[in-house]
C-alpha cells in the first residue's frame, strides 16, 4: 500500500506550509481505511466487536459535541478500526451489510472533521470559519451534553413536533425538540447557536446522537399570543374549565395586559357583517382536554414551545401528534358545516373607544392553526390597543435584531413562533442554525404570506425576509385580518396594500414600508438598516434602551 503525501491547504494570504507529522498520519490512515474496506483483513478475535465499536463511537460523539475534534477523530478512527476487523468474522450477512453502512457513515464524519478542523493551519489569533468552532460566543459549547442524560426524563405531553419532558430528579419541565442530522456537513452553512437573545426562548442544553440533535428548551407556559387573543375575545368558547392551568395563566396575565376592549364600528358599517357563530369545541380522542386552552401549533426548526397538553399517563411512549387537539372554528353565520348547525351565541362588538378592531382570521389549520380559525372558516373578531401591539412589536424587533447580529435568519416567522410569558411579554421560539441540519421552511407560512415572496426561490436570502414576516404579523395584529385574507391572490410588485381607513398614519406607514415586494426596498434594509426601522414614528414612544436592559 502506498503512502499518501499530504500538504495543508493554505489560508488566504498565507504561504503553503508542510503538514505536521500527526496530520500526515491522519491522511495515511484515511487511505488505509479505504483500502481495507475494499480488500479486508480477517484478523478479528471472537470478542463482541459491536460493543467495543459502540463505546468508541459514543466517545467520538461526546468529543465532537465539546469541540475536541482531535480526540473525536481518534475515537472515530478506533471505532472504524474495530468494525473493520469484526466484519470479516461476523457470520451474519445482514449484520455485515449494516456494519458496512455504519463504517461509511463514520468514515465520512472523520473526513469532515479532518478537512474542517484538523487540516486548516491556524495563524495566531485566527479562528476557524466552519463547524461548531464558528460560534461567536465560546461559552455556549458548555451546553453540549451526552444524549444518555435524557434517559432520566419522561415525556408528559406532546405539542405537535416537540415534547414536554419532566426531569425525574428535579421535577422540572422543559421542552425537547429533535432536529434530524443529514450527516453531510455544509461548509457554506455554519453552525450558529444564538445566546443572550432578548425576548427569545432560552436554549438550556443540547444533546447529540448519531442521527439527531436534541434541543433542551425553556418551557414558556403562557402559550401563543394568537391563542391568548382568541381566548380573550371568546372566553365562553375557549374550552377552559374552572381551575385549569390556562385559567391560572390568565389570572397572572390580566394584571399586566388590558388587551381587548369593545371596538367602535366605522360609520356606515353594517353590524350584521361582524356577526359570527362559534362552534362548540371538539376534542381529539388521542389526547384528553385536561382543561387546557387552544394554542397555535408550531411547525419549525424553530424550535418552539407553547403550552402543552399534559398526558394523563405520564408514559415516555411518544404518541404521534394528532391532527388537531381542540377545534374552535369561527364561521360566518349560516355557513354549513358537517357537524350541523353551530350552537352558541352570536357576538356583535359594541361600545366606544380609541382602539383597533377588525375581523381576524387565524392561520392555516396545519402548522399555523390557532386551533380554531383556519383559511375559509370565517372570521373571529378581536380588538387590541395599538399601544399594546406597539410594545409586542418592539420586543419582537429587538429579538430579530439580535438574531441577525449573530447571523441567524428565521425565514418563516409565523404566529406559532410568538409566545407570551407570565408577565405578558413576547417570547420568540428558539431559532438557530446547524451545519448538519438542512433548513426547512413551513409551507403554510409561505402560502399564507407570513414568509417573504423570495423565500423558496433561488436568490440568496437576507434579513429582509424576516422584516417581511415582521410586517405580516403586525398587519394581522393591527388590522385584525391576516394579510393572506386581505390579498387572497398574493402580493406582487404592482400590488397596492389594502389597509383599513381607521388605521393610524404611523401604523399604515410602517406596514407599507415593511411589506415591499422588493427585498432591498423594505424598511430595515439599505442605508440606516434596523436603526431606521426603530426610529420610525410608529415606535416614537418606545424607549429602546430600557427595552433591551
From Swiss-Prot:
Residues annotated as the enzyme's active site: 412
Keywords recorded for this protein, A-Z: ATP-binding, Kinase, Nucleotide-binding, Ribonucleoprotein, Ribosomal protein, Serine/threonine-protein kinase, Transferase
All copies of domain MIT, residue ranges: 87-115
Reactions this protein catalyses: L-seryl-[protein] + ATP = O-phospho-L-seryl-[protein] + ADP + H(+); L-threonyl-[protein] + ATP = O-phospho-L-threonyl-[protein] + ADP + H(+)
Record's GO cellular component terms: ribonucleoprotein complex; ribosome
A Pfam family: Pkinase
Positions bound to ATP: 151-159, 177
Regions annotated as coiled coil: none
UniProt-annotated stretches for the region Disordered: 260-325
Keyword Membrane: no
Ranges for domain Protein kinase: 145-539
PANTHER family attached to this UniProt entry: RIBOSOMAL PROTEIN S6 KINASE, RIBOSOMAL PROTEIN S6 KINASE-LIKE 1
Protein name as it appears in the record: Ribosomal protein S6 kinase-like 1
Species name: Pongo abelii
Upper lineage: Eukaryota, Metazoa, Chordata, Craniata, Vertebrata
Amino acid at each position: 500500500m502506498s503512502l499518501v503525501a499530504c500538504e495543508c491547504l493554505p489560508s488566504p494570504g498565507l504561504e503553503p506550509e508542510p503538514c505536521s507529522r500527526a496530520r500526515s498520519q491522519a491522511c495515511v490512515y484515511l487511505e488505509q481505511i479505504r483500502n481495507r474496506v475494499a480488500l479486508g483483513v480477517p484478523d478479528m478475535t471472537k470478542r463482541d466487536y459491536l460493543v467495543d465499536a459502540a463505546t468508541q463511537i459514543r466517545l467520538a460523539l461526546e468529543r465532537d459535541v465539546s469541540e475536541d475534534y482531535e480526540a473525536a477523530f481518534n475515537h472515530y478512527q478506533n471505532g472504524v478500526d474495530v468494525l473493520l476487523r469484526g466484519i470479516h468474522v461476523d457470520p451474519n450477512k445482514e449484520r455485515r451489510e449494516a456494519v458496512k453502512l455504519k463504517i461509511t457513515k463514520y468514515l465520512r464524519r472523520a473526513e469532515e472533521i479532518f478537512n474542517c478542523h484538523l487540516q486548516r493551519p491556524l495563524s495566531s489569533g485566527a479562528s476557524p470559519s466552519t463547524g461548531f468552532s464558528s460560534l461567536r460566543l465560546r461559552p455556549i459549547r458548555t451546553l453540549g451534553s451526552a444524549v444518555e442524560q435524557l434517559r432520566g426524563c419522561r415525556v408528559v405531553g406532546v405539542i405537535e413536533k416537540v415534547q414536554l419532558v419532566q426531569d425525574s430528579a428535579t421535577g422540572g419541565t422543559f421542552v425537547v425538540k429533535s432536529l434530524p442530522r443529514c450527516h453531510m456537513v455544509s461548509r457554506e452553512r455554519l453552525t450558529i447557536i444564538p445566546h443572550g437573545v432578548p425576548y427569545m426562548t432560552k436554549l438550556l442544553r443540547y444533546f447529540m446522537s448519531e442521527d439527531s440533535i436534541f434541543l433542551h428548551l425553556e418551557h414558556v407556559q403562557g402559550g401563543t399570543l394568537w391563542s391568548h387573543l382568541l381566548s380573550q375575545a371568546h372566553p365562553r368558547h375557549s374550552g377552559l374549565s374552572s381551575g385549569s392551568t390556562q385559567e391560572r395563566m390568565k389570572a397572572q396575565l390580566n394584571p399586566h395586559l388590558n388587551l381587548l376592549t369593545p371596538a367602535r364600528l366605522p360609520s356606515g358599517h353594517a353590524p350584521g357583517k361582524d356577526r359570527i357563530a362559534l362552534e362548540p369545541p371538539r376534542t381529539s380522542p388521542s389526547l384528553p382536554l385536561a382543561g387546557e386552552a387552544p394554542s397555535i401549533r408550531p411547525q419549525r426548526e424553530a424550535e418552539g414551545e407553547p403550552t402543552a397538553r399534559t398526558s394523563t399517563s405520564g408514559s415516555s411512549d411518544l404518541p404521534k401528534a394528532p391532527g388537531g387537539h381542540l377545534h374552535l372554528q369561527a364561521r360566518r353565520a349560516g355557513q354549513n358545516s358537517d357537524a350541523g348547525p353551530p350552537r352558541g351565541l352570536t357576538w356583535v362588538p359594541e361600545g366606544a373607544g380609541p382602539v383597533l378592531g377588525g375581523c381576524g382570521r387565524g392561520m392555516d389549520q396545519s402548522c399555523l392553526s390557532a386551533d380554531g380559525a383556519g383559511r375559509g372558516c370565517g372570521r373571529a373578531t378581536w380588538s387590541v390597543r395599538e399601544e399594546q401591539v406597539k410594545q409586542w412589536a418592539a420586543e419582537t424587533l429587538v429579538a430579530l435584531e439580535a438574531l441577525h447580529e449573530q447571523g441567524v435568519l428565521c425565514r418563516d416567522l409565523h404566529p406559532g413562533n410568538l409566545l407570551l410569558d407570565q408577565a405578558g411579554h413576547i417570547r420568540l421560539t428558539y431559532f438557530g442554525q446547524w451545519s448538519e441540519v438542512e433548513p426547512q421552511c413551513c409551507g403554510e407560512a409561505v402560502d399564507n404570506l407570513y414568509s417573504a415572496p423570495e423565500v423558496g426561490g433561488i436568490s440568496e436570502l437576507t434579513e429582509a425576509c424576516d422584516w417581511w414576516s415582521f410586517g405580516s404579523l403586525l398587519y394581522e395584529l393591527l388590522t385584525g385580518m391576516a394579510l393572506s385574507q386581505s390579498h387572497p391572490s398574493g402580493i406582487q410588485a404592482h400590488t397596492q396594500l389594502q389597509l383599513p381607513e381607521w388605521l393610524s398614519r404611523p401604523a399604515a406607514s410602517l406596514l407599507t414600508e415593511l411589506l415591499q415586494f422588493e427585498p432591498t426596498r423594505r424598511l430595515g434594509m439599505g442605508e440606516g438598516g434596523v436603526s431606521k426601522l426603530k426610529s420610525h414614528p410608529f415606535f416614537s414612544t418606545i424607549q429602546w434602551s430600557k427595552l433591551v436592559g
